[in-house]
């Protein structure tokens, strides 16, 4: 994802249901990181949101340089440095009461560890889909 910005104020989006339907038609399981496919399917069943992008996150270290791997980080004394590639999920949220409650719940997730968990907008997503947020 590109430029993260502070969360924007939701706006009315009369095309939400059509966009949600179009998105579900275009969703390809092969493009979703295997460990989170079922979670993404469940989220997309909610009537007030749909996912735009997601990434499970990937560990890179000496001996594992595949930036698309889904392998868990092994327990090993030989690994001295790990690069963790960002994990995120981006949603489009409907401008209704359920959507607003969902958005408020997402914002609260950052209280788990606000140093590493962020709630934001991604400018590149908002430009093509209003009411898009990432965590």
What residue ranges belong to the model's regions?
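Structured alpha/beta or helical-core interaction and ligand-binding surfaces enriched in interleaved
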Residues: 1-135
């Amino acid at each position: 994802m590109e430029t993260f910005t502070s969360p924007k104020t939701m706006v009315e989006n009369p095309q939400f249901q059509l966009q949600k339907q179009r998105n579900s038609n275009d969703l390809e399981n092969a493009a979703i990181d295997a460990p989170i496919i079922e979670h993404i399917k469940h989220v997309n069943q909610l009537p007030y949101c749909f996912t735009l992008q997601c990434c499970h996150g990937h560990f890179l270290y000496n001996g594992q340089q595949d930036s698309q791997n889904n392998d868990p980080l092994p327990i090993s004394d030989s690994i001295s440095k790990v690069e963790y590639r960002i994990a995120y999920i981006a949603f489009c949220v409907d401008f209704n009461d359920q959507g607003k409650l969902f958005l408020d719940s997402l914002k609260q997730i950052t209280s788990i560890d606000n140093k590493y968990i962020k709630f934001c907008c991604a400018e590149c997503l908002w430009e093509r889909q209003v009411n898009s947020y990432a965590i």
